[in-house]
């Protein structure tokens, strides 16, 4: 009985749904007719001047210089447009002429077989204006489709530290290649969300950054949390999916049988809708629990990191202190070695000085000794001279005595006396005696005996060989 009521209720609800579906189809057909009428209208004329565009109704003048922001880079991937539904016979020159109103085009590419192309304008603002004005414009029986081209060299950066700005993000990723744009995503209050976008000028730089950051740990600040890099999801949040682009197949018509509505309580739709809501709620709760677990794990890791950082700093300070102590010890050893070397050098210098002084003293003594020996060799000393004079005196006395006993040799008259010492010698016949000296008393005694016949000397002197008193020393 209850099932019949449910069936009747669904049957009653199905009747107005079909009526609403019929009105929806009629509204859709009216929209298609209006679009066809707009396509049949001639396109607005495109001025040849690329610096300004004037409207017949409003008379607007566009200065292209005003659409460039200060410091904005030109001809980037963000100003690249995709143009679809192109005629198969369109040329590159016609493509440039179509967009010359919006400034000089930097890049033009046409794929005639597939009927699409790409064009790059100077700035993002000019590309947006061209997109709005040329989208859905009829050209040779086809309706142009203008969209922003997908940026294949853009990356999403996660786990950004709190104090990372756009400039720092661009500077950090510029090591991989030329960066066209780097943005740190913030919330409605301007607080960083920990995510960012980096757009490179080419795919090789983006691939290099993706590989390097995946293999290693890329740090942007002192906080040792590495960033994660992944390809950016190309999502169109501006145009979305218009009705005219939806594929009208059998599944489309089946889904569009029911209009937007609230499920009636107690119905089949309501029962399974509630089950779907329970599943979504469970997913949300589990996601919240996962987020809480991750948050707790992050806080715990940050606390451990701070403790480890403090310990690491203490260890570094200890190592630095030990290094400085070792350096001081090494410097002290070097100083001691230098002092020892200096002392040894001073000792060697002192020893060398003493040796030189000793050598000089020896040389002086040797020189004096040689001088004395040379003086003695030339002039005999007083003692030797006395001995020699004594011997000469004794020999002279003996000669005089002998001459007194012998007759004188006859000398012829007129013969001069012989020169030399013999002429100076005293003659016994004349009764002359040589003068006596105190030192040669023996010779005087002998001379007196021989010449005068025993006259005593001036003072009694013992003969040679006589013994002296005990306290007297013998003189030679």
Swiss-Prot record:
Q: Composition bias, kind Basic residues: at what positions? A: 14-27
**Which keywords fit this entry according to its UniProt record?**
Acetylation, Activator, Biological rhythms, Chromosome, Coiled coil, DNA damage, DNA recombination, DNA repair, DNA-binding, Immunity, Innate immunity, Isopeptide bond, Methylation, mRNA processing, mRNA splicing, Nucleus, Phosphoprotein, Repeat, Repressor, RNA-binding, Transcription, Transcription regulation, Ubl conjugation
- Where is the region Disordered? 1-56, 448-476
> Any keyword Lipid metabolism?
no
Instruction: Give residue numbers for the modification (N6-acetyllysine).
Output: 5, 11, 203, 300, 376
* Leader sequence residues: none
Compositionally biased spans, kind Polar residues = 1-10
Iron as UniProt keyword = no
Q: Which residues form a coiled coil?
A: 274-378
Name of this chain's protein: Non-POU domain-containing octamer-binding protein
Species of provenance: Rattus norvegicus (Rat)
Q: By which gene is this protein encoded?
A: Nono
């Amino acid at each position: 009985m209850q099932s019949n009521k449910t069936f009747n209720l669904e049957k009653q609800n199905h009747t107005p749904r079909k009526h609403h579906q019929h009105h929806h189809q009629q509204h859709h057909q009216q929209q298609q007719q209006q679009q066809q009428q707009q396509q049949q209208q001639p396109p607005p004329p495109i001025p040849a001047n690329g610096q300004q565009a004037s409207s017949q109704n409003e008379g607007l003048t566009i200065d292209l210089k005003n659409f460039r922001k200060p410091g904005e880079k030109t001809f980037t991937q963000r100003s690249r447009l995709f143009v679809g539904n192109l005629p198969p016979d369109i040329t590159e020159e016609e493509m440039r002429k179509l967009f010359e109103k919006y400034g000089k085009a930097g890049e033009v590419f046409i794929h005639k077989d597939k009927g699409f192309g790409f064009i790059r304008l100077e700035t993002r603002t000019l590309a947006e204006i061209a997109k709005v004005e040329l989208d859905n414009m009829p050209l040779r029986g086809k309706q142009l489709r203008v969209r922003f081209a997908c940026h294949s060299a853009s990356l999403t950066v996660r786990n950004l530290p709190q104090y990372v700005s756009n400039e720092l993000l661009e500077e950090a990723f510029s090591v991989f290649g030329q960066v066209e744009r780097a943005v740190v995503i913030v919330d409605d209050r301007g607080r960083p969300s920990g995510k960012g976008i980096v757009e490179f000028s080419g795919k090789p730089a983006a691939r290099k950054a993706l590989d390097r950051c995946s293999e290693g740990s890329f740090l942007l600040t002192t906080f040792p949390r590495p960033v994660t890099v992944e390809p950016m999801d190309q999502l169109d949040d501006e145009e979305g999916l218009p009705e005219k682009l939806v594929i009208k197949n059998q599944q489309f018509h089946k889904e569009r049988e029911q209009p937007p509505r609230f499920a009636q309580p107690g119905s089949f739709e309501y029962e399974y809708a509630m089950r779907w809501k329970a599943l979504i709620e469970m997913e949300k709760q589990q996601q919240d629990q996962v987020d809480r677990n991750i948050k707790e794990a992050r806080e715990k890791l940050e606390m451990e990191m701070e403790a480890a950082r403090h310990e690491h700093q203490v260890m570094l300070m200890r190592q630095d202190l030990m290094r400085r102590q070792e350096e001081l010890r090494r410097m002290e050893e070097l100083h001691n070695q230098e002092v020892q070397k200096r002392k040894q050098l001073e000792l060697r210098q002192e020893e060398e000085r003493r040796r030189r002084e000793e050598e000089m003293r020896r040389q002086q003594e040797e020189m004096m000794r040689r001088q004395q020996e040379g003086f003695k060799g030339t002039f005999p000393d007083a003692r030797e001279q006395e001995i020699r004079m004594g011997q000469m005196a004794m020999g002279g006395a003996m000669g005089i005595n002998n001459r007194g006993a012998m007759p004188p040799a006859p000398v012829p008259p007129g013969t001069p006396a012989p020169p030399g010492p013999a002429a100076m010698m005293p003659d016994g016949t004349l009764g002359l005696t040589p003068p006596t000296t105190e030192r040669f008393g023996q010779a005087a005694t002998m001379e007196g005996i021989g010449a005068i016949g025993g006259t005593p000397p001036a003072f009694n002197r013992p003969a040679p060989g006589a013994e002296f008193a005990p306290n007297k020393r013998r003189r030679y």
